[in-house]
Amino acid sequence: SCHILLDSLQKICLMHGIEVDYYKKLFQTAGNIIELIEKDDIPKYLLFLENVFPYMDNYNYQKGMKEIIQELKNFLKPKDIGTDSDRALLLDFQATLEIKPEKAIKLEKDALAQIENITADNARLVSNLHANLGGLYRMNGHPDLAREHMEKSISLLDQFNLLHINDSIPQIANYAMFLTEQQEPERGISELQKLSGIIKEYHSDDCLDYAKVQETLGTIYLMTANLPQAKTHFKR
């Protein structure tokens, strides 16, 4: 059954932090599905595309990413198909592949504009959009706007009790590095220490996520020339 195939591919794409050596075959299968499958359950199909895209992004598989964007565009043309979140994700995906910074920033802003009311169902998405926009502002020399959107993304995770999910790790790590660049390393360290505690509570101190946070802490201590502390965190 097509449902079983879609489900199994989605499960692979949602396995956090796990890379597979057969990713090319996986993406070819996804491409064949886009081309050949009968799309009779549109919400499920859209969700499939939206879960596969970030996994392709991990491998910089631009051919497949472009195919997914085109497919989403085709499906979301009629206003009665898809949700505000689907449309926001399409714009976010377009921003991912956009080379011009001003255009990418506009696409992320348009993505945020799609969602009028933030709810428990879309808070994670809105938080990610703010984080992405903050990252673009940071890379393009707009520290005040970067700070505004990064802080908004983290406050949404906090507000909706989502700080323990995997999305929070790159968001808080990037924010901590940004604070260090802005000569506020103590605040960055404090944010990462809080995150370490949350990961330890919800998961363990023996997982990849915990190690990533320790690595970021070590990097910040290295940047601030605190070698003993840097060594401690790199060892963890």
Where are these regions (language model features)?
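Short coil/turn linking the two alpha-helices of tandem helical-hairpin repeats
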Residues: 13, 53, 80, 95-98, ...
